[in-house]
Amino acid sequence: MNRSEALFEQAKKTIPGGVNSPVRAFNGVGGSPLFIEKADGAYIFDADGNKYIDYVGSWGPMILGHNHPKIRQAVLDAVENGLSFGAPTELEVKMAEKVIAMVPSIEQVRMVSSGTEATMSAIRLARGYTNRDKILKFEGCYHGHADCLLVKAGSGALTLGQPSSPGIPEDFAKHTLTATYNDLASVRSLFELHPDAISCIILEPVAGNMNCIPPIPGFLQGLRGLCDEFGALLIIDEVMTGFRVAMGGAQAHYGVVPDLTTLGKVIGGGMPVGAFGGKKAIMQYIAPTGPVYQAGTLSGNPIAMSAGLAQMEALCEPGLYPALAEKTQRIALGMKAAADKHSIPLSITYVGGMFGFFFTTDSAPMTSFAQVTQCNMEHFRYFYHAMLAQGVYLAPSAYEAGFLSMAHGEDELAMTLKAVDSVFAEMKVAFKL
């Protein structure tokens, strides 16, 4: 038994399942999870001293790479002044100004401590502003673990084989309507059934919790039009995509203007941060200026704000996003070329600094939750563990996107694609493809 395995056994005695977030338990791929001791640049290092090229990036935030010197120094400087005040600081004002400057649809923003808090609060605000109870989400999209959102959710819920969760009363779930991602007709039919009851649509603009499914042309714009037609708000959940796929998020990349936006991950620089913001007229409904209550002891935490500001400022470097997109494209297209070489049925997707790969014989572009659930999980599990043995760390679930960082250089890309080629050669023999 190696040290990671021993730590996992020890953890299971005191932590449910041995982990503090379900996907980390490796249930989707089998075996024991790696316990990580440190990370630097494009690499993570486990408790046994093994080094891996990392394509998880703490599930998205580490867009500059791990342990970036500017972010680390910003945190060290902030710690000198104390860890938490529970009072306003100049740092949170600067952070709000930075977010508003980088996301044109946001006129005011409220800081929270997680993506779940951000989506939960944005939905409460939408309900309060419209005086309507129902929300509309999409099958396979994940927006955190708030009760109203764990209905046909993606990501960890899919990995566990549970489209929803026990512990959610039917009275809560009945207000959550579920449509088909990339299918405007399914959305319109729900609006026509409940024309005056839907407060908002909430969606991931790139569905990153059923792997990586981009919107088809016109889908986001169609949702904007339906919200306008039926008097609902459009909430774009950019917790994952915000500053990951483009400077102004996926909404800037695809040219759609939401009423509210949720953020997280990248804006924290690796620290626990979430945010929700939008039009001033809507945001004024949040306490203390309005009747919709939201609060948090650690909201706007000075250490988190310092880390986030350092990362956001670094992201303004000219040419950064085109360079990140080019790296991501090389990995995705390189994987596809290797798969074709070895007759491995594989489909790929990529946008900005996110990518997805799917072991499927479906020749159509990957656009739906239904397609993802039909992918070959046996192939994925084999590929996952073989890549791990080659020193490449991918998300341990077929329902999670991959992430690159600016720290992934020529050597890392070349080593990764060499490993992919080697593993696909193994798979061709192992599965008689």
UniProtKB/Swiss-Prot annotation:
Transmembrane segments: none annotated. SUPFAM superfamilies: PLP-dependent transferases. The keyword Membrane does not apply. GO terms for biological process: protoporphyrinogen IX biosynthetic process. It is an enzyme of class 5 (isomerase). Pathway: Porphyrin-containing compound metabolism; protoporphyrin-IX biosynthesis; 5-aminolevulinate from L-glutamyl-tRNA(Glu): step 2/2. Its EC number is 5.4.3.8. Its main location: cytoplasm. One of its GO terms (molecular function) is glutamate-1-semialdehyde 2,1-aminomutase activity. It comes from the Bacteria. Belongs to the class-III pyridoxal-phosphate-dependent aminotransferase family. HemL subfamily. Homodimer. This is Glutamate-1-semialdehyde 2,1-aminomutase.
